[in-house]
Protein backbone atom coordinates (compact mmCIF):
# COMPACT_ATOMS: atom_id res chain seq x y z
CA UNK A 1 0.00 0.00 0.00
CA UNK A 2 1.40 3.40 -0.90
CA UNK A 3 1.98 5.90 1.86
CA UNK A 4 0.22 9.22 1.36
CA UNK A 5 1.84 12.43 2.54
CA UNK A 6 0.23 15.70 3.49
CA UNK A 7 1.45 19.25 3.37
CA UNK A 8 3.74 20.93 0.88
CA UNK A 9 6.83 18.82 1.41
CA UNK A 10 8.05 18.45 -2.17
CA UNK A 11 11.14 20.23 -3.36
CA UNK A 12 10.44 23.90 -3.05
CA UNK A 13 13.39 24.84 -5.24
CA UNK A 14 11.67 23.68 -8.43
CA UNK A 15 9.93 26.60 -10.07
CA UNK A 16 6.74 25.46 -11.75
CA UNK A 17 6.58 26.53 -15.39
CA UNK A 18 3.75 28.27 -17.16
CA UNK A 19 2.79 25.48 -19.55
CA UNK A 20 -0.42 24.61 -17.74
CA UNK A 21 -1.48 28.24 -17.54
CA UNK A 22 -0.63 29.08 -21.13
CA UNK A 23 -2.05 25.97 -22.80
CA UNK A 24 -5.63 25.33 -21.79
CA UNK A 25 -6.33 21.61 -21.50
CA UNK A 26 -8.83 20.07 -23.85
CA UNK A 27 -11.12 17.11 -23.29
CA UNK A 28 -10.03 15.39 -26.49
CA UNK A 29 -8.11 12.24 -25.68
CA UNK A 30 -5.78 11.39 -28.57
CA UNK A 31 -4.15 8.26 -27.13
CA UNK A 32 -4.80 6.21 -24.01
CA UNK A 33 -3.72 3.00 -22.35
CA UNK A 34 -5.62 0.58 -20.14
CA UNK A 35 -3.83 -1.97 -17.99
CA UNK A 36 -0.61 -2.09 -20.01
CA UNK A 37 1.95 -4.64 -18.82
CA UNK A 38 5.35 -5.12 -20.45
CA UNK A 39 7.57 -8.18 -20.10
CA UNK A 40 11.15 -8.74 -21.22
CA UNK A 41 11.22 -12.51 -21.17
CA UNK A 42 10.25 -13.42 -17.61
CA UNK A 43 11.00 -9.92 -16.29
CA UNK A 44 7.77 -8.03 -15.59
CA UNK A 45 9.07 -4.51 -16.32
CA UNK A 46 5.86 -2.45 -16.35
CA UNK A 47 2.77 -3.11 -14.28
CA UNK A 48 -0.86 -2.41 -15.17
CA UNK A 49 -0.40 1.15 -16.45
CA UNK A 50 -3.36 3.28 -17.53
CA UNK A 51 -2.93 6.86 -18.80
CA UNK A 52 -4.67 9.23 -21.21
CA UNK A 53 -2.95 11.81 -23.40
CA UNK A 54 -4.83 14.92 -24.52
CA UNK A 55 -4.56 17.12 -27.58
CA UNK A 56 -2.85 20.39 -26.72
CA UNK A 57 -1.06 18.99 -23.68
CA UNK A 58 2.46 17.89 -22.82
CA UNK A 59 2.73 14.97 -20.42
CA UNK A 60 6.07 14.35 -18.70
CA UNK A 61 7.09 10.90 -17.48
CA UNK A 62 9.56 11.09 -14.60
CA UNK A 63 11.22 8.65 -12.23
CA UNK A 64 14.57 7.00 -11.48
CA UNK A 65 16.52 5.05 -14.09
CA UNK A 66 15.03 1.66 -14.83
CA UNK A 67 11.60 2.53 -13.44
CA UNK A 68 9.67 1.75 -16.64
CA UNK A 69 9.02 5.18 -18.12
CA UNK A 70 10.91 4.61 -21.40
CA UNK A 71 9.49 1.09 -21.62
CA UNK A 72 6.02 2.61 -21.36
CA UNK A 73 6.83 5.34 -23.90
CA UNK A 74 8.03 2.78 -26.44
CA UNK A 75 4.84 0.79 -26.02
CA UNK A 76 2.76 3.74 -27.23
CA UNK A 77 3.81 3.34 -30.87
CA UNK A 78 4.69 -0.35 -30.60
CA UNK A 79 8.45 0.23 -30.66
CA UNK A 80 8.81 -2.59 -28.13
CA UNK A 81 7.94 -5.00 -30.92
CA UNK A 82 11.46 -4.40 -32.20
CA UNK A 83 12.93 -5.93 -29.02
CA UNK A 84 13.36 -9.70 -29.05
CA UNK A 85 11.53 -11.37 -26.19
CA UNK A 86 9.43 -8.31 -25.33
CA UNK A 87 5.71 -8.82 -24.79
CA UNK A 88 3.11 -6.10 -24.26
CA UNK A 89 -0.31 -6.83 -22.79
CA UNK A 90 -3.26 -4.50 -22.31
CA UNK A 91 -5.00 -1.90 -24.44
CA UNK A 92 -3.35 0.96 -26.33
CA UNK A 93 -6.23 2.92 -27.83
CA UNK A 94 -5.59 5.19 -30.82
CA UNK A 95 -8.13 6.29 -33.40
CA UNK A 96 -10.83 4.19 -31.77
CA UNK A 97 -9.00 0.87 -31.87
CA UNK A 98 -6.64 -1.17 -29.73
CA UNK A 99 -3.44 -0.95 -31.75
CA UNK A 100 -1.77 -3.52 -29.51
CA UNK A 101 -3.95 -6.30 -30.93
CA UNK A 102 -4.67 -4.99 -34.41
CA UNK A 103 -2.50 -6.04 -37.32
CA UNK A 104 -1.01 -2.59 -37.69
CA UNK A 105 1.11 -1.30 -40.53
CA UNK A 106 3.86 -0.09 -38.22
CA UNK A 107 5.22 2.37 -40.76
CA UNK A 108 1.83 4.04 -41.09
CA UNK A 109 1.26 3.96 -37.33
CA UNK A 110 4.55 5.71 -36.65
CA UNK A 111 3.57 8.46 -39.08
CA UNK A 112 0.74 9.27 -36.68
CA UNK A 113 2.59 8.57 -33.43
CA UNK A 114 6.06 9.91 -34.12
CA UNK A 115 9.14 9.57 -31.94
CA UNK A 116 12.22 11.68 -31.24
CA UNK A 117 15.06 9.78 -29.61
CA UNK A 118 17.67 10.60 -26.99
CA UNK A 119 20.47 10.96 -29.52
CA UNK A 120 19.87 12.87 -32.76
CA UNK A 121 19.54 10.33 -35.58
CA UNK A 122 19.38 12.15 -38.92
CA UNK A 123 19.55 10.10 -42.09
CA UNK A 124 22.81 10.04 -44.03
CA UNK A 125 21.24 12.40 -46.53
CA UNK A 126 20.97 16.11 -47.16
CA UNK A 127 18.92 18.34 -44.88
CA UNK A 128 16.29 18.56 -47.63
CA UNK A 129 16.13 14.80 -48.16
CA UNK A 130 15.79 14.17 -44.43
CA UNK A 131 12.50 16.05 -44.52
CA UNK A 132 11.03 14.68 -47.75
CA UNK A 133 12.17 11.05 -47.53
CA UNK A 134 9.10 9.70 -45.71
CA UNK A 135 6.51 11.96 -47.41
CA UNK A 136 7.82 10.89 -50.83
CA UNK A 137 7.53 7.27 -49.76
CA UNK A 138 3.89 7.99 -48.94
CA UNK A 139 3.22 9.45 -52.37
CA UNK A 140 3.88 13.19 -52.10
CA UNK A 141 5.13 14.42 -55.45
CA UNK A 142 6.00 17.68 -57.15
CA UNK A 143 8.90 19.97 -56.37
CA UNK A 144 6.61 22.80 -55.33
CA UNK A 145 4.81 20.57 -52.83
CA UNK A 146 8.04 19.14 -51.46
CA UNK A 147 9.69 22.55 -51.18
CA UNK A 148 6.68 23.89 -49.30
CA UNK A 149 6.72 20.94 -46.90
CA UNK A 150 10.43 21.38 -46.21
CA UNK A 151 9.99 25.05 -45.37
CA UNK A 152 6.87 24.42 -43.27
CA UNK A 153 8.55 21.63 -41.29
CA UNK A 154 11.81 23.48 -40.72
CA UNK A 155 9.94 26.60 -39.66
CA UNK A 156 7.91 24.46 -37.28
CA UNK A 157 11.17 23.24 -35.78
CA UNK A 158 12.59 26.80 -35.59
CA UNK A 159 15.39 25.76 -37.94
CA UNK A 160 14.51 27.35 -41.29
CA UNK A 161 16.45 30.58 -40.87
CA UNK A 162 19.57 28.64 -39.88
CA UNK A 163 19.57 26.17 -42.79
CA UNK A 164 17.55 27.68 -45.65
CA UNK A 165 20.73 28.43 -47.62
CA UNK A 166 22.29 24.98 -47.13
CA UNK A 167 19.45 22.53 -47.67
CA UNK A 168 21.64 20.42 -49.97
CA UNK A 169 24.35 19.98 -47.35
CA UNK A 170 24.66 16.85 -45.25
CA UNK A 171 22.52 16.72 -42.12
CA UNK A 172 25.72 15.83 -40.28
CA UNK A 173 27.12 19.28 -41.01
CA UNK A 174 24.72 20.60 -38.34
CA UNK A 175 25.43 20.94 -34.63
CA UNK A 176 23.95 18.43 -32.20
CA UNK A 177 21.12 20.76 -31.25
CA UNK A 178 20.36 21.53 -34.88
CA UNK A 179 20.37 17.82 -35.73
CA UNK A 180 17.82 17.19 -32.99
CA UNK A 181 15.61 19.98 -34.32
CA UNK A 182 15.99 18.48 -37.80
CA UNK A 183 14.73 15.17 -36.42
CA UNK A 184 11.76 17.02 -34.95
CA UNK A 185 11.15 18.74 -38.31
CA UNK A 186 11.28 15.33 -39.98
CA UNK A 187 8.62 14.13 -37.56
CA UNK A 188 6.47 17.24 -38.09
CA UNK A 189 6.55 16.64 -41.85
CA UNK A 190 4.29 13.62 -41.29
CA UNK A 191 1.73 15.74 -39.36
CA UNK A 192 1.52 13.32 -36.41
CA UNK A 193 -1.25 13.33 -33.82
CA UNK A 194 1.23 12.39 -31.08
CA UNK A 195 4.96 12.98 -30.67
CA UNK A 196 6.95 10.90 -28.19
CA UNK A 197 10.20 12.40 -26.88
CA UNK A 198 12.64 10.03 -25.15
CA UNK A 199 15.02 12.29 -23.19
CA UNK A 200 15.50 14.53 -26.24
CA UNK A 201 17.80 17.01 -24.48
CA UNK A 202 20.08 14.70 -22.51
CA UNK A 203 22.96 15.16 -24.98
CA UNK A 204 22.41 18.89 -25.58
CA UNK A 205 23.81 22.08 -24.08
CA UNK A 206 21.51 24.43 -22.11
CA UNK A 207 20.85 26.77 -25.05
CA UNK A 208 19.87 23.89 -27.34
CA UNK A 209 17.77 22.42 -24.53
CA UNK A 210 15.83 25.66 -24.19
CA UNK A 211 15.27 25.73 -27.95
CA UNK A 212 13.82 22.20 -27.87
CA UNK A 213 11.57 23.06 -24.93
CA UNK A 214 10.24 26.17 -26.67
CA UNK A 215 9.72 24.10 -29.80
CA UNK A 216 7.65 21.50 -27.95
CA UNK A 217 5.42 24.20 -26.55
CA UNK A 218 4.99 25.80 -29.97
CA UNK A 219 3.89 22.61 -31.76
CA UNK A 220 1.70 20.98 -29.09
CA UNK A 221 -1.51 22.85 -29.94
CA UNK A 222 -2.48 20.43 -32.71
CA UNK A 223 -1.31 17.23 -31.03
CA UNK A 224 -0.39 15.45 -27.82
CA UNK A 225 3.22 15.31 -26.65
CA UNK A 226 4.74 12.81 -24.22
CA UNK A 227 8.27 13.36 -22.90
CA UNK A 228 10.48 11.12 -20.79
CA UNK A 229 12.95 13.20 -18.81
CA UNK A 230 15.29 12.82 -15.84
CA UNK A 231 15.38 16.61 -15.55
CA UNK A 232 12.70 17.59 -13.05
CA UNK A 233 13.15 21.29 -13.80
CA UNK A 234 12.47 20.51 -17.45
CA UNK A 235 9.33 18.55 -16.58
CA UNK A 236 8.09 21.43 -14.46
CA UNK A 237 8.79 23.98 -17.22
CA UNK A 238 7.20 22.30 -20.21
CA UNK A 239 4.49 19.91 -19.09
CA UNK A 240 0.82 20.24 -18.26
CA UNK A 241 0.65 16.82 -16.62
CA UNK A 242 3.31 14.68 -15.00
CA UNK A 243 3.34 10.95 -14.24
CA UNK A 244 5.81 9.45 -11.75
CA UNK A 245 7.06 5.91 -12.31
CA UNK A 246 8.85 3.76 -9.73
CA UNK A 247 9.94 0.12 -9.98
CA UNK A 248 7.61 -0.60 -12.88
CA UNK A 249 4.57 1.10 -11.35
CA UNK A 250 2.93 4.35 -12.42
CA UNK A 251 2.68 5.68 -8.87
CA UNK A 252 1.05 9.08 -9.30
CA UNK A 253 -0.20 11.26 -12.13
CA UNK A 254 -1.74 14.71 -12.10
CA UNK A 255 -1.42 18.33 -13.07
CA UNK A 256 2.25 19.27 -12.99
CA UNK A 257 1.89 21.95 -10.32
CA UNK A 258 0.11 19.46 -8.04
CA UNK A 259 2.72 16.75 -8.63
CA UNK A 260 5.61 19.04 -7.75
CA UNK A 261 4.03 21.15 -5.02
CA UNK A 262 1.59 18.73 -3.36
CA UNK A 263 2.65 15.12 -4.01
CA UNK A 264 0.36 12.55 -2.44
CA UNK A 265 2.65 9.52 -2.41
CA UNK A 266 5.69 9.39 -0.13
CA UNK A 267 7.80 7.77 -2.85
CA UNK A 268 7.17 10.72 -5.15
CA UNK A 269 7.97 13.19 -2.40
CA UNK A 270 11.18 11.33 -1.58
CA UNK A 271 12.18 11.40 -5.25
CA UNK A 272 11.48 15.12 -5.59
CA UNK A 273 13.44 15.95 -2.43
CA UNK A 274 16.46 13.88 -3.47
CA UNK A 275 16.05 10.98 -1.07
CA UNK A 276 16.78 8.72 -4.06
CA UNK A 277 17.39 9.21 -7.78
Model features per residue range: what roles?
Residues 91-108, 168, 259:
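ABC ATPase NBD Q-loop/coupling interface
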Residues 91-98, 143-165:
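Conserved ABC ATPase "signature" region
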Residues 169-174, 178:
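Conserved ABC ATPase signature
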Residues 191:
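Conserved catalytic motifs of ABC-family nucleotide-binding domains
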Residues 195-198:
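Catalytic Walker B motif of ABC-type/P-loop ATPase nucleotide-binding domains
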Residues 253-254:
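ABC ATPase "signature
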Amino acid sequence: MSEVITGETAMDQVVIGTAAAEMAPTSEVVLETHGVNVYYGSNHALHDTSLAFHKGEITALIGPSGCGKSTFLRSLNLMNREIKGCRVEGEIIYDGRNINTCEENLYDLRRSIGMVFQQPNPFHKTIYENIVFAPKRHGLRGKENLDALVEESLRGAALWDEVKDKLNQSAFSLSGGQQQRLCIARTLAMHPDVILFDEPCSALDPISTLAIEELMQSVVKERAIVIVTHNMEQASRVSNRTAFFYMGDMVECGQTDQIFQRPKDKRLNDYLTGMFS
